[in-house]
Amino acid sequence: MAYPSPKVYIAFNGLPYDVSPTFVDVTSYVRAINTHRGRTDDFTQFDIGTATVILDNRTRLFDPFYTSGTYYGKLTPRLQIKITATSAAVEYDVFRGFVSGWPVTWSEAGKDSTVTLQCFDALGLMANEQVPNDWSDYYTRSLAPLRFYRGNDSRTTGTIRDQIYDNLSLSTVSTNPTFFEQPSLAANIPGTSATVISYAATGTAQASPDRLSFACFMRAVTPNTTDDVYFNYDNGTSGIFIQIYQDGQYYIETKFSGGSRQGGGYIGFAPSSQSFHMAVSGNTATNVVLYINGQQITNTTNSSSARTGSNPEKAEVQFANFQDWSIYNLTLSSAQVNLLYNAGTGRFSETSSARLTRLVGTTSFSSSLCSFTASPVATVSEIGSGTGVVPEMQLVADSEGGNLYVSKSGVLTLTARRAVFTDTRSANVQATIQDTGSALKYGTEVEISYDADNLKNDVTINFTGDGQVVQTNTTTIAGFGASSTLIETQLNSPTSANDLATYELGTQGALVPRIQPIDLSPNTADADWTTILGLELLDRVTFIRTPSVGNSFSRAALINAIDHTFIPGQTQTQVSLSMRYTSPLILDDSVRGKYDFNYYG
């Protein structure tokens, strides 16, 4: 039998996040290879893919402590590794990932030495990374502010720190010796906010910008109709002035001053007891643009004259409870304002694919090695803070009702909810696996189970804002007993949660056969290795068992896991199959295998 020829490549001169590193072929030193990609059941996301490669180290070529070695100084953790297999002159990807380390083993009285590489895929690379503890801080800094006052200082300091430039200190016109610590004004900003009477910071003028913006969360604390709340920033030639005052109800007046640049407006807003997010931006081409809680407000231009700048540069706040006040030498766009607002509230309403893109963006992993569905059905809102990147990604995948895995070529992949029914390789048979005939063969032993152990007929979906929906299948509960499952999501609405519950109840509530992992290698024809090596997770196959008595067993299935073993002179491949997405039955229909429309929507 002509087994496939495995190859192992290592990028000794590359870095973990390089997209296209230069790989070096080390196949001649390989003693054994094992790879695993997949999951153990139908109800969990795919595991981190792994590989084990045993290298001959008798010459100490792969010993990180051998100072005369060819790769000395380059045998570091997280080097990229690629495993392929060639059959019929075609090289197929088997695994791409990263080396955990370089453990050297000596045996046979020191005459033999090996290095056993434990490897993991991209999910493993990101497994120790966390999403930001504070999204507001993360995104504010990403916009490169001139000044950034968080307002979370201790009152004993008497100073409000600028994260970028100058601290805010007690203004000379104030009789209040300090500021007051208050609860956070936004759900996703940790720490405290600051209530001030009058605080200011002056310093050497910055380069004169031709545009200015600022944003903050705030609550007006004006004690009466004569004391106005205001934020002021000018750099000597231009500036923004925000005044909040009472006249039967609260109003905001905005001005952008300096030269011919000016704008003003009055707009009513919520009572002072309610916090809100405010952003103001302007430039030479337009008047001031005002945003409240991420929404642009149409200003009514007033007749006030432009405020004139004064040296030195000054940032000042009076009579306000504020948090995360940031000032920019740019015109904030609507998207940027929404980013700051959503970061503070911990709510980003976006598709599951957009959320994964956001999460990957907090790491150094390249977006060019990502493939997220272009047709997501889920909109998520809530977002975690300080949680692991990978668990957060899997939570998004659960919200979509899709699958998250790393392909054999190293691409981080998210499928859409119904991709198991509609994607080309999941909807069309890629191989037939049977015990007779000319198709792919499997071993002499096979176990087929038919029970309710993996059936879920009581589905609970948790969603954003501590919401929860529950759906049950009374027919299967009556027939097989109740079996519950809880799915945590970040879905944005009860409607979305109900849609997911309907889908999951249809798939998880189906009574389907289960096949133990099967070995494809015994008696496999040489030409069939090209088919085996071409298989990928979630590919559709047909499984056939022909007993010596009675009818045959023939069912479609999707691949849940693929394991390869390469040793000199032998190759073994084992697959785990799932019939959950290929065998939906209408329980009260006499035609076994008839599709239930509600099963796949």
Language model features with spans:
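Short beta-strand-to-coil "C-cap" segments at the C-terminal boundary of structured domains/repeats
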Residues: 326-331, 416-419, 580-584
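Assembly/oligomerization scaffold segments
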Residues: 1-134, 145, 154-335, 340-371, ...
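Short beta-strand-centered aromatic/proline hotspots
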Residues: 94-104, 554-565
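Envelope-exposed proteins and targeting segments
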Residues: 49-51, 95, 113-115, 410, ...
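Aromatic-rich beta-strand edge motifs centered on tyrosine
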Residues: 244-246, 450-452, 581
